[in-house]
From Swiss-Prot:
Keyword presence, Nucleus: no
Predominant cellular place of this UniProt entry's protein: membrane
Glycosylation: residue positions: 95, 147
Subunit field text: Homodimer; disulfide-linked.
UniProt gene name: CLEC2D
UniProt function note: Receptor for KLRB1 that protects target cells against natural killer cell-mediated lysis. Inhibits osteoclast formation. Inhibits bone resorption. Modulates the release of interferon-gamma. Binds high molecular weight sulfated glycosaminoglycans.
Membrane topology: Single-pass type II membrane protein
PANTHER family the UniProt entry points to: C-TYPE LECTIN DOMAIN FAMILY 2 MEMBER D, C-TYPE LECTIN DOMAIN-CONTAINING PROTEIN 180
CDD domains: CLECT_NK_receptors_like (cd03593)
Extracellular membrane side: 60-191
Tissue: Detected in peripheral blood leukocytes, osteoblasts, lymph node, thymus and spleen. Isoform 1, isoform 2 and isoform 4 are expressed in T- and B-lymphocytes, and at lower levels in NK cells. They are also expressed in B-cell lines and LPS-matured monocyte-derived dendritic cells.
Full protein name: C-type lectin domain family 2 member D
Matching InterPro entries: C-type_lectin-like, C-type_lectin-like/link_sf, C-type_lectin/matrix_domain, CTDL_fold, NKR-like_CTLD
Membrane-spanning intervals of the chain: 39-59
Amino acid sequence: MHDSNNVEKDITPSELPANPGCLHSKEHSIKATLIWRLFFLIMFLTIIVCGMVAALSAIRANCHQEPSVCLQAACPESWIGFQRKCFYFSDDTKNWTSSQRFCDSQDADLAQVESFQELNFLLRYKGPSDHWIGLSREQGQPWKWINGTEWTRQFPILGAGECAYLNDKGASSARHYTERKWICSKSDIHV
């Protein structure tokens, strides 16, 4: 006897799946494609980030070699940025005390030179005119910056005056009442 539930049916070859694992293979292929796409996306983003880091590093390295690359947008108009400071180079002339008063009115001081690179920048940028800086001394006393710290002899100061200025050869000194151009400086953080 034949059970009606167990009926054998003839199946033609066209009705058979081409590959018995075909459904599993398609799922595997889709997953593999997604994994490769994700891998390439991660690689692309990694290359972009590395390129940005390299570009920023190159710009930062140029800051020390070529100051014009690093002009600070944070500085007020007519001030020049260099190594996280803003500098103002006057066109007018005043004595040392009046020059400091002007700088003070701008929330700044006469320039304090903190490195050899900064000195070179100031000497190049100031042009041929002499400019007061924030270094002075009382008769027979050591040189002090406007903020009260002692000068550490980073560069020679010629002359016997009580106030320092930059000329075309470096630093020199003169009496406080002599009129010269001046350089103010302030941190670009305060701008």
